[in-house]
């Protein structure tokens, strides 16, 4: 371990988070973390990308997983020539495959840049604006809630209890006239 970096058991190089670097109570190496039964924190920017399973959380299983059979189907008794069916299958599959690759090559990096900026702004606003506003509101509303609670218990509770006692002796009887 040198210069704020360490290597895990698989040989991956990780940076030590800034918060962890100066804290003597938190271990910076795996052996010490295991010894103290603490979870090792990894830097999110150095994790590996799985090039085989590109949708590990199954976000697009039901949306864009469209095959030839999902789009084009010939019912029994209405079949085209076998050669046409095979050529249609090949044309559809190859066109979809290469056109997707072309679109992702042209627009993938710009779209990743746009979405990265968007989610960075969204995260920034959530961390630095939304959560502090909500916390501030909860602190301010706490004093109002105490006053409101006192008002309910001293004014509304006795009032509605008295109204309830007044109407508790009211009896309604329904008779059907023939």
From Swiss-Prot:
<feature type="lipid moiety-binding region" description="S-palmitoyl cysteine">
    <location>
        <position position="133"/>
    </location>
</feature>
<dbReference type="Pfam" id="PF01146">
    <property type="entry name" value="Caveolin"/>
</dbReference>
<feature type="cross-link" description="Glycyl lysine isopeptide (Lys-Gly) (interchain with G-Cter in ubiquitin)">
    <location>
        <position position="39"/>
    </location>
</feature>
<keyword id="KW-0007">Acetylation</keyword>
<feature type="lipid moiety-binding region" description="S-palmitoyl cysteine">
    <location>
        <position position="156"/>
    </location>
</feature>
<keyword id="KW-0564">Palmitate</keyword>
<feature type="modified residue" description="Phosphotyrosine; by ABL1">
    <location>
        <position position="14"/>
    </location>
</feature>
<feature type="lipid moiety-binding region" description="S-palmitoyl cysteine">
    <location>
        <position position="143"/>
    </location>
</feature>
<feature type="region of interest" description="Interacts with SPRY1, SPRY2, SPRY3 and SPRY4">
    <location>
        <begin position="131"/>
        <end position="142"/>
    </location>
</feature>
<feature type="modified residue" description="N6-acetyllysine; alternate">
    <location>
        <position position="5"/>
    </location>
</feature>
<dbReference type="GO" id="GO:0060090">
    <property type="term" value="F:molecular adaptor activity"/>
</dbReference>
<dbReference type="GO" id="GO:0008142">
    <property type="term" value="F:oxysterol binding"/>
</dbReference>
<protein>
    <recommendedName>
        <fullName>Caveolin-1</fullName>
    </recommendedName>
</protein>
<feature type="modified residue" description="Phosphoserine">
    <location>
        <position position="37"/>
    </location>
</feature>
<feature type="topological domain" description="Cytoplasmic">
    <location>
        <begin position="2"/>
        <end position="104"/>
    </location>
</feature>
<keyword id="KW-1017">Isopeptide bond</keyword>
<dbReference type="GO" id="GO:0030154">
    <property type="term" value="P:cell differentiation"/>
</dbReference>
<feature type="region of interest" description="Interacts with SPRY1, SPRY2, and SPRY4">
    <location>
        <begin position="149"/>
        <end position="160"/>
    </location>
</feature>
<feature type="cross-link" description="Glycyl lysine isopeptide (Lys-Gly) (interchain with G-Cter in ubiquitin)">
    <location>
        <position position="47"/>
    </location>
</feature>
<feature type="cross-link" description="Glycyl lysine isopeptide (Lys-Gly) (interchain with G-Cter in ubiquitin)">
    <location>
        <position position="30"/>
    </location>
</feature>
<feature type="cross-link" description="Glycyl lysine isopeptide (Lys-Gly) (interchain with G-Cter in ubiquitin)">
    <location>
        <position position="26"/>
    </location>
</feature>
<dbReference type="GO" id="GO:0070836">
    <property type="term" value="P:caveola assembly"/>
</dbReference>
<feature type="modified residue" description="Phosphotyrosine">
    <location>
        <position position="25"/>
    </location>
</feature>
<feature type="cross-link" description="Glycyl lysine isopeptide (Lys-Gly) (interchain with G-Cter in ubiquitin)">
    <location>
        <position position="57"/>
    </location>
</feature>
<dbReference type="GO" id="GO:0051480">
    <property type="term" value="P:regulation of cytosolic calcium ion concentration"/>
</dbReference>
<dbReference type="GO" id="GO:0019901">
    <property type="term" value="F:protein kinase binding"/>
</dbReference>
<keyword id="KW-0597">Phosphoprotein</keyword>
<feature type="modified residue" description="Phosphoserine">
    <location>
        <position position="9"/>
    </location>
</feature>
<feature type="modified residue" description="N-acetylserine">
    <location>
        <position position="2"/>
    </location>
</feature>
<dbReference type="GO" id="GO:0005925">
    <property type="term" value="C:focal adhesion"/>
</dbReference>
<keyword id="KW-0472">Membrane</keyword>
<dbReference type="GO" id="GO:0000139">
    <property type="term" value="C:Golgi membrane"/>
</dbReference>
<dbReference type="GO" id="GO:0031623">
    <property type="term" value="P:receptor internalization"/>
</dbReference>
<feature type="region of interest" description="Interaction with CAVIN3">
    <location>
        <begin position="82"/>
        <end position="94"/>
    </location>
</feature>
<dbReference type="GO" id="GO:0005768">
    <property type="term" value="C:endosome"/>
</dbReference>
<feature type="region of interest" description="Interacts with SPRY1, SPRY2, SPRY3 and SPRY4">
    <location>
        <begin position="167"/>
        <end position="178"/>
    </location>
</feature>
<keyword id="KW-0449">Lipoprotein</keyword>
<keyword id="KW-0333">Golgi apparatus</keyword>
<feature type="region of interest" description="Required for homooligomerization">
    <location>
        <begin position="2"/>
        <end position="94"/>
    </location>
</feature>
<feature type="intramembrane region" description="Helical">
    <location>
        <begin position="105"/>
        <end position="125"/>
    </location>
</feature>
<feature type="topological domain" description="Cytoplasmic">
    <location>
        <begin position="126"/>
        <end position="178"/>
    </location>
</feature>
<dbReference type="GO" id="GO:0048471">
    <property type="term" value="C:perinuclear region of cytoplasm"/>
</dbReference>
